[in-house]
Amino acid sequence: MSKGPGLFADIGKYAKDLLTRDYSTDQKFSISTNSVSGVALTSTALKNGVLHAANVATQYKYRNTFFDVKIDTDFNVKSLVYPMNKFVSIDHNTLTGYDTTSRTFTKYNVGVSVTKPDQCVSIILGDKGDSIKASYVYYLDESTRSATVGEVIRKISTNETTVTVGGLYAVDHLTNVKAKLNSNGKFGALLQHEGLPKSIVTISGEIDTKTLDKYPRLGLSLSLKP
């Protein structure tokens, strides 16, 4: 039974997570704690070459509402409040932005997704109609979370199309392997292992198959949840 529409960001989220989540060429460390009242606090430090960054995020769930606040080292504050709804099998949503000064739409996106127990299809018309993104996820084994994914992004104004395929394979309940390859020749892979309960080590890398003479980019991430 539907309790209402989901968030626009959730359309295509399954495919996006498989193709982007935990892929990194940086050095990252994060630690999370949870209080008995339900407040989750996460501190993250990131190093990318000579650039250092950090942020603190807190999350709180009250009944059917989720609160998320994030503050970074530049004192930028991002907050989000949204209801926790059960998604229906077919979901559609629209995201718009309007500039009252220029009286123009700065953003207009439309998305549709169809979800089944073993697969998910989504289509998003974005950039005010200039881009189309279609994705398909198929879960090979729900018990092990293994899945394959394909994504096609078409930029109408530049006549460019990017195709990305990838997948996730659960070696066991503690270890995951992911890989992806796009039509531009970029290949990425990662190994993720839960050494301690809720504490995860991720080693990832990326290489441009069109320039194999260059060294691959590597990343290391450690996430601790006492």
UniProtKB/Swiss-Prot annotation:
It comes from the Eukaryota. Its main location: mitochondrion. Pfam families: Porin_3. It is found in: Mitochondrion outer membrane. The keyword Transport applies. Putative channel that allows diffusion of small hydrophilic molecules through membranes. Belongs to the eukaryotic mitochondrial porin (TC 1.B.8.1) family. Consists mainly of membrane-spanning sided beta-sheets. This is Putative mitochondrial outer membrane protein porin 5. It comes from Arabidopsis thaliana (Mouse-ear cress).
